[in-house]
Every structure is written in structure tokens, then in C-alpha cells.
């Protein structure tokens, strides 16, 4: 009820803007039951009701039937008129509910700062000027078909006045309680002072005041309760007393339903939910097996995946432990054999070093019809590269390019070669090169 009364007062305040033809129409919105989701239509003002009344409007007829088609009425209920202007048509297209996000309405409500939008040349927009002004628990929009210069004073005036209109009246904030012998107090002149809701004085009460309590001639106490519980006013014959009922206000605060709770900072609440959703999306991206897309399903799948990783980790640790034990046993056996026969150990170590020293690794890959890639890894020593080139030449291969890389005492040579004849296999070429390299050492 308070919102409807405030909307009527806002329409009365905004109507002169439309009457003066400064703006073509205005729309009033209020925040819905969930302020962070949608806004609801409250009312509007249209300039279509102020066209020349001497113009005769005829109902259009449908061809062939002779039936008259009734024109629809404009949504502005201040002065009932039919849809006959662009402003009326634009109002008929507005929905009763509109989502806040994503859109310009949500930005204005969240930032609580007005926006003055001017459309310079786009044919998609019907209006050239559009103004969105945030007010208390609502939003005001003004539209014009032509371009309007920015008027900061008008915007501030609308914000201040409309916000005041939506605030509750002082008498809605008070609880009046008249204690015994109220009739005697009303018969004699008293002065009333109201704390927290303004001040007023009453002297020589009229017949209206007597009729107000005429229905309770034998009542010892009359209470007038309002929606909001605030300090109560006590009227006594001896003197005026203003007492604040703190206990009642605390009890009423405890009894407030949670459904009427409104967040003080919708922007921070929205950011918090976005962070939670982003974390959920990140968790869902990491877990490979997702059975359900709800929050409970994502968490349960993540727990199962972590348990699987722990089991796999334990298996790998056991396997690594077994490998280490085998290596330790082999080392211990070698040490025991070396202690038993040191001369044999010395001979075997020398032979192993010699084998490793003279080891040559060759890889051959076919890259084309006659093209081959040869990779040779050997010990870096004198005339090693020369022997490799000679072996390639003996195989009747043409060298296209050579890449030479050295690390400590190891050398890797990569050659791109081309054969002079067809039918050369990679395996045969590799064995031939390896044989030539070993015999030349």
C-alpha cells in the first residue's frame, strides 16, 4: 500500500514534465520481491492525452465485413485516451516485469547513479533521449523522441523528490497508546509532543477527535497500532510524557520474517556468488569424471577422484620401494663378489669402460623417396667425425646438411642425406653404417 501511494505521488510530480512537452513519456518501476532479480511496473505518464481535443478520431473498419475495430486504450490512467501517438504505442510495449541483469537497469540500480543516454543516429532505437534515475526502492525512466541536452539539476531534483515520496509518513512510524481516563484528557486542552516523527500541538479538541473515540466510551485504554513499531506516545491528564518502548521494539525486531530481509549491499552479494560459482567451475574442470552438474554431485565426484589419486599414489610408492630394494640387493651382491675376487672385478670394470667408450648408436629414418635422416651418437674423440663422413661416402650417400651437437664427452651428429639409387631400406643402411663405424675405430 505504501508503495502504491508513493507511486501515485511520483506520477503527480512527474506529470508536469510530460504536460510541458519536454518529455514524451515517463515510466515508474519498483524493485520486486527479490530486489536483485527484477523490477515491477508501477505507473506511467503519457503525452498522448494532451493532443488537440478538437481532432475527431474515427474507429477503423475491417474490409468486407463492416465490423468496427475498437482501438485499445493507453496505459496512462490519468486521462483515459486511445492509442493515437508514438508515445502511447511505446507504452503498450513495456512489460509488467523486467529482469535487472544483464541490462542498463541493473547497472543503474546497483551503482545508484543516473544515466543520460542520447541516441545520435541508430535506427534501431525509437527514442533519441533516455534518462534513468534511481530512487528509493525503485527506478524512474524518461523518454523523448528528440535529443535533449544534459540537465543535471533536473536529475537531482527527481532523485531527491521521488526518494522522499517513497519514504513512509511520520504517523506510520508511531504507535499511539492512550492510558486510562483518556476521555477526561481529551475534554481538557493538552499539548502533544512527538519524538522521532516531528512535533505537533493540539488544543481545544474538536468534535472530530471526540468521534474518533466515541466507539469506546467505557474503554480504559485505546491503542492504535501501526506497521512499524517505534516509540509510543502516552497522554496523561497531569502532564505530557513521552516514553520509548524499547522492549517492544526489540521483540518486534526478533519477530520480523526473514522473507522481508533485503541485502544492504547487493553488489557485494553478487560478487560473492560469482566467486563461489567460479570456484565450482574450476573444480568441475579439474575433475575428469562428473556424474551430475549440481553442487552436491561436483563435490562428491571430487572426493571420489581424490580417493582414487591417493590409492594410485600408494601403489606407485610401493612399486618404487620394491625397485629400490632390488637395486640395493644387486649392489650388495656386487660388493660381496668384489671382496671375494678383487682381480676379476678390476678386469670386468676395465672391459665395461672400454665397451662404453667405444659404443656407437645410429638411427636411420626415411623422410622421402630417397631422402634419409641419420642420427649418430658417439664419444667425442679425434677423427670421429671424419670416419662418419667416410662411412657415409662409402654408402654412396649425398650429404645435404649436417648438424653437430656436443655435451661433455658425447657428440650427436644429425645428417640429411640423399641416396643415388632406389630400393635402400633403413635397416640395411643402419647396419652398414654401424659396421663401418665399428671397424674403423
UniProtKB/Swiss-Prot annotation:
Expressed constitutively in roots, leaves, stems, and flowers. It comes from the Eukaryota. Its main location: nucleus. Keywords: DNA-binding, Nucleus, Transcription, Transcription regulation. Residues 260-309 form the bHLH domain. Disulfide bonds: none annotated. One of its GO terms (biological process) is regulation of DNA-templated transcription. InterPro entries: bHLH_dom, HLH_DNA-bd_sf, MYC/MYB_N, TF_AMS/ICE1/BHLH6-like. GO terms for cellular component: nucleus. It is found in: Nucleus. Pfam families: bHLH-MYC_N, HLH. GO terms for molecular function: DNA binding; DNA-binding transcription factor activity; protein dimerization activity. PANTHER family: TRANSCRIPTION FACTOR BHLH90, TRANSCRIPTION FACTOR SCREAM2-RELATED. Homodimer. This is Transcription factor bHLH90. The lineage of its organism: Eukaryota, Viridiplantae, Streptophyta, Embryophyta, Tracheophyta.
